[in-house]
């Protein structure tokens, strides 16, 4: 974990985006305002464990302000939907992909600008992460579920 200065330009952009979220989606902003930002190299983008929002400095630097707004909304949705609590024994990578498919369609519907490469597929509209996991498992070779254990931020 890296502690960052309030003078940090990337932290400033995240805080500004979080404030903008307050006017666009106040309920989600309330969730996001309660989560501290922590810099990490364990993810290439941003992530949440339900208690913090982890960010990769390079991702923040290359993202537009509108993309940061969308990603913060995305992370707030993860928390609101309890994705950090519902994974159970599902492989963490598979779970994150399924949860992202479910959430990104909501972000898109809110007319926010997701970064290039965001996981979007209309076939998953209206489905839960659990339902998407089942569909994704049908498309891939059998893989055993992972035992439930704490995972580092992604």
Put a short name on every predicted segment.
Residues 1-70, 76-154:
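Short, functionally important secondary-structure microenvironments
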């Amino acid at each position: 974990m890296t502690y960052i200065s309030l003078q940090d330009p990337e932290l400033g952009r995240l805080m500004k985006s979080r404030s903008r979220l307050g006017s666009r989606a106040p309920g989600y902003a309330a969730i996001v305002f309660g989560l501290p930002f922590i810099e990490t190299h364990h993810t290439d983008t941003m992530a949440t464990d339900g208690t913090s929002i982890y960010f990769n400095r390079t991702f923040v630097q290359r993202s537009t302000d509108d993309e940061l707004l969308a990603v913060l909304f995305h992370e707030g949705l993860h928390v609101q939907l309890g994705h950090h609590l519902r994974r159970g024994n599902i492989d963490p990578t598979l779970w994150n992909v399924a949860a992202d498919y479910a959430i990104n369609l909501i972000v898109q519907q809110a007319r926010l600008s997701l970064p290039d490469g965001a996981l979007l597929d209309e076939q998953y509209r209206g489905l839960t992460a659990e339902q998407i996991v089942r569909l994704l498992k049908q498309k891939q070779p059998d893989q055993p579920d992972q035992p439930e254990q704490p995972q580092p931020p992604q």
